[in-house]
């Protein structure tokens, strides 16, 4: 069955509705409209001073200065009824919970993964 669509409908079919942004998350979100995001999935530094077996480290994993500003912006851009999923370091859960609550998030649950190799935390 064929459907007739006009030019405007045709163009809207190919207009991107999703985007991947690369940059400092706090700065990027400051430029976004309030309540413009449906879903956030974030895997931020865990504040554990991670060091892999090969000596690799993670930027900003040695301090929590970014934590509250980042989650404040996430809460600001997230639509009412939107959903945010955040990974976090289990031994720093108190810092993450404080930041989530201070931003206005309501915690509804935790998901625990069984990993064969978990990095050590100092």
PLM features per residue range, with description:
Residues 2-122:
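Core catalytic lobe of class I
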């Amino acid at each position: 069955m064929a459907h007739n669509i006009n030019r405007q409908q045709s163009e809207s079919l190919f207009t991107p509705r999703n985007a991947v942004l690369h940059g400092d998350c706090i700065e990027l979100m400051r430029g976004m409209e309030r309540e413009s995001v449906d879903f956030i999935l974030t895997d931020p530094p865990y504040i554990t001073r991670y060091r892999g077996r090969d000596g690799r480290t993670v930027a900003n994993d040695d301090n929590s200065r970014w934590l509250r500003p980042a989650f404040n912006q996430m809460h600001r851009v997230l639509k009412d009824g939107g959903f945010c999923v955040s990974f976090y370091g289990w031994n720093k859960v108190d810092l993450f919970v404080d930041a989530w609550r201070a931003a206005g998030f309501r915690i509804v649950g935790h998901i625990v993964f069984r990993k064969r190799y978990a990095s050590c935390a100092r």
